[in-house]
Amino acid sequence: MKLKRHGQKGGKVDIEGILDNVEKFKPLISDHVGWSEEKGQLHPSTIDALIRIGVPRFFLPSGLGGYEITPIECARVTEAIADIDASAAWFVMVFNAARLAGAAWNDEVIEMIFRENPDTLLSASGNSPYQAVEKEDCYQIDGVNHFASGCRHAEWMLSPVRLENELATVLLPMNDCEILDDWDSLG
């Protein structure tokens, strides 16, 4: 499959090229909708298609290989993907919401996560804060997060954490987390 390069137009990524690539992946993504619904997670081929479309790079700085598209452009792509697979469109939102949160991170953290692989996937959750207890030179983080979209495909988990009497945000490597397979969206 030949994909359009996301060429720059006056310093901006060609959003029409991204939308063309969504259309090219339409058959592959739609072929796996049933599997994804049955398994409660996106099919690996769908995740691969989203990466090849460029989803993880939407809000990433251009210096790290990102596209720096606008929220409106992201919404256009998300809408096009939702026409194929609503669950895949949800992941577009989740993966990019975590990147938007990254705008507040220091450069060291951003470099650590994205320098080697701008397609690194982050899962995010805004509920069920973990509990952090300060130790000698670190924090011990514990808890259960009852809802974390994209966690099976992500390398990092972004979540709220309670530090004594204040809320903060924690970024955890997924290989330090255990996924409990108890999600049933219908109840």
Residue ranges and their predicted role:
Residues 15, 120, 138, 176-177:
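Short linear motifs in intrinsically disordered/low-complexity regions
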Residues 1-60, 66-76:
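Alpha-helical interface subdomain recognition
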Residues 44-52, 57-154:
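Glycine-rich flavin
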Residues 144-183:
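DPxDG-like acidic metal-binding loop motif
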Residues 129-131, 179-187:
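Short Gly/Thr-rich strand-loop-strand
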